[in-house]
Amino acid sequence: SNTGPFGDAFAPPYDDPYVVTSGSTTGSSESLADVQPPNDQAAEKAVLGAMLLSKDLPPLMHQIVRAEDFYTPAHGRIYDAIIKLSSNEEPADAVTVADQLEKDGELERIGGRPYLHTLIESVPSPASGPYYAQIVAEKALLRRLIDAGMRITSYGYAATEGMEVEEMVNRCLLYTSDAADEG
């Protein structure tokens, strides 16, 4: 049963499978500090690889996923370079993206030219790129919700006598609304 951080007095009246307390939702003994935020590295690599293989995909992917949706910062940088080239109607393949990243001073930070070829090799099918992009976007939304939850929790703990509870509630609602709207 879920007793919550303050014992049984504040526990929900039911077991919520989505509440993570001392472990993960799978019942392992990991603490929340040990749990990696939601992400899917295979999907991130497949999105980028698909974009490198198909000149038609970058505009479509840009409607589904943004650079900040990638958990791995290097993947966001690569995505930005692909979108930059594509929006200028230039080819966005491993060679041109590497050149763009080099101009931007980012090539070594993303793992160099060989990493771009690794991305291409990781794509099961470029046609599935939009599906992988949706996975990346959903994982990013989950991370934003976690961030909103952490902010809400900190408001609850930081409440002072002078702070209006209604104002705190409105801020908390704004955080969750913003997290959902960005998704």
Predicted regions, residues:
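Noncatalytic partner-interaction/assembly domains of nucleic-acid and motor enzyme complexes
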Residues: 1-141
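N-terminal non-cleavable signal-anchor helices
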Residues: 20-21, 168-170
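Short amphipathic alpha-helical coiled-coil/interface segments
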Residues: 149, 169-174
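Secondary-structure edge/capping motif, primarily at the C-terminal ends of alpha-helices
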Residues: 149-160
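Conserved small/polar residues in nucleotide/adenosyl-binding loops
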Residues: 175-180
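Extended, polar beta-sheet/loop recognition surfaces of beta-rich domains
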Residues: 183
